């Protein structure tokens, strides 16, 4: 999940290929199948699964996000008037505590925030996949990194086992790069954009290659059906040519030519417009098993927050139609039920909310749209707000199922309502079963 989407407007265009890619193999349990002008689907068991990806993100677990687990960060609070002294990300969390204390607190968090029962619940609720974010620092670090390292991998392995036990599939998502790929707090290091600096790129590539080699091995392919090369690279501020040529293409070559794996790779769209990636790593150029991951929110810009409900629905449906003619198989790997940015720290520590006019980020401010009071208390929600939230969720599900499916952000939080699938389901704001529709055909589609 991100917080600075108003920056995202620039487009770059480039096309390049590597020599002699490994040819596509026959369809198997890790190949995508498609027919012209039809939705692509995942072939889990040497036959069509018959449904799109319907997944949840395991957010705030192996990569900290203050709004998901605020108690970890509230421990640093020194006054009630502002967030001064509270670390803004995992980098500073570990730096402030020192390695030993950070390790103790993080191990406690990793051991308790998710349990196998959560994965059993996810499966029983009809989901078929979990996307698990993890940072580069779990596998490799820079010399001066304060991160706790080397321990997250065992928790990831445990989670993959939980998924297997409950017939869930997994995307392993490299969520944070050395130097940060986007400057968001969820990259591990806020306000930095140095991912493509040579030493940072080398460490990130080392971590990625480890992930690719391990989780593309035969023992994992029954469960791990995709590896995301990097989450949300901020294309408008990065050198896209360098990212493609020095990171994405080498990753593909390493996967196909060095370790000779037919694992699926996931590429985030880098906040580029639909069809931007249509001439990069395409089937016609000999590439295969490449998926584009789009992320969609409507709460990180004041104009979006001011939209009418019909406008929100229209935009959501356009997210679905926008990918119908994209060259790659596509999934919406992040979206949410949220229609406000009221959840504390969802915009990052210290920034406030645009919705109630408390947003301050340098010279940027916002004007009042509505109150954020009691935002996480469902008893304070009007019937209209509940209806709007359910409408918005259903429209997004229908839109994303026009192609490969969806993975909602995220399964649970400590206290948020708008960002917590468990709470949304409990309060009837997220469909159960997942195909149930109180507001059918909002995108002129039919419910399955």
From Swiss-Prot:
Return the broad EC class.
hydrolase
**Gene Ontology MF terms:** glucan exo-1,3-beta-glucosidase activity
Cysteine pairs forming cystine bridges in this chain are 317-443, 342-372
A Gene Ontology term for the protein's cellular component: extracellular region
Domain of life (superkingdom)? Eukaryota
**PROSITE patterns attached here?**
GLYCOSYL_HYDROL_F5
Substrates-to-products reaction catalysed: Successive hydrolysis of beta-D-glucose units from the non-reducing ends of (1->3)-beta-D-glucans, releasing alpha-glucose
Q: Which SUPFAM superfamilies match?
A: (Trans)glycosidases
Grouped into one coarse class, the protein's main location is secreted
Kindly identify the residues recorded as the active site. Answer: 232 (proton donor), 334 (nucleophile)
Q: What is its EC number?
A: 3.2.1.58
Q: What is the similarity comment for this entry?
A: Belongs to the glycosyl hydrolase 5 (cellulase A) family.
The protein's role, per its UniProt record: Beta-glucanases participate in the metabolism of beta-glucan, the main structural component of the cell wall. It could also function biosynthetically as a transglycosylase.
User: Would you tell me the protein name for this molecule?
Assistant: Glucan 1,3-beta-glucosidase
Name the species this protein comes from: Saccharomyces uvarum (strain ATCC 76518 / CBS 7001 / CLIB 283 / NBRC 10550 / MCYC 623 / NCYC 2669 / NRRL Y-11845)
What gene codes for this chain? EXG1
């Amino acid at each position: 999940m991100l917080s600075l989407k108003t920056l995202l407007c620039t487009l770059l265009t480039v096309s390049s290929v590597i020599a002699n890619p490994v040819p596509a193999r026959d369809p198997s349990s890790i190949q995508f199948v498609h027919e012209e002008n039809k939705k692509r689907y995942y072939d889990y068991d040497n036959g069509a699964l018959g449904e799109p990806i319907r997944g949840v993100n395991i957010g705030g677990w192996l990569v900290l996000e203050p709004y998901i687990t605020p108690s970890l960060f509230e421990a640093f609070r020194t006054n009630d008037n502002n967030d001064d002294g509270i670390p803004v990300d995992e980098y500073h969390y570990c730096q402030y505590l020192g390695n030993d204390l950070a390790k103790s607190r993080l191990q406690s968090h990793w051991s308790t925030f998710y349990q196998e029962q959560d994965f059993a619940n996810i499966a029983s609720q009809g989901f078929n996949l979990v996307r698990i974010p993890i940072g580069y620092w779990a596998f490799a670090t820079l010399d001066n990194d304060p991160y706790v390292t080397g321990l997250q991998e065992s928790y990831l392995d445990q989670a993959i086992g939980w998924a297997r036990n409950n017939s869930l599939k997994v995307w392993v998502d490299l969520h944070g790069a050395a130097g940060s790929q986007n400057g968001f707090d969820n990259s591990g290091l806020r306000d930095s954009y140095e991912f493509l600096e040579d030493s940072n790129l080398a460490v990130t590539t080392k971590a990625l290659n480890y992930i690719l080699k391990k989780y593309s091995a035969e023992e994992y392919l029954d469960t791990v059906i995709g590896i995301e090369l990097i989450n949300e690279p901020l294309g408008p501020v990065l050198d896209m040519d360098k990212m493609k040529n020095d990171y994405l293409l080498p990753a593909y070559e390493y996967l196909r030519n060095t370790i000779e794996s037919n694992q699926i790779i996931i590429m985030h769209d880098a906040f580029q417009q639909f069809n931007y990636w249509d001439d990069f790593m395409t089937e016609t150029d000999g590439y295969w098993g490449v998926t584009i991951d789009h992320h969609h929110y409507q709460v990180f810009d004041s104009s979006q927050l001011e939209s009418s409900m019909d406008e929100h629905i229209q935009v959501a449906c356009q997210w679905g139609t926008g990918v119908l003619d994209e060259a790659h198989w596509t999934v919406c790997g992040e979206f949410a039920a949220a229609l406000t940015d009221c959840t504390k720290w969802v915009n990052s520590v210290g920034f406030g909310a645009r919705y109630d006019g408390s947003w301050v980020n340098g010279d940027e401010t916002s004007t009042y749209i509505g109150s954020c009071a009691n935002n996480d208390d469902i008893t304070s929600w009007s019937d209209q707000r509940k209806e709007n939230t359910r409408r918005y969720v259903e429209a997004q599900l229908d839109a994303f199922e026009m192609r490969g499916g969806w993975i909602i952000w995220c399964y649970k939080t400590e206290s948020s309502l708008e960002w917590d699938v468990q709470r949304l389901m409990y309060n009837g704001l997220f469909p159960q079963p997942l195909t149930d529709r109180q507001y059918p055909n909002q995108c002129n589609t039919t419910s399955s």
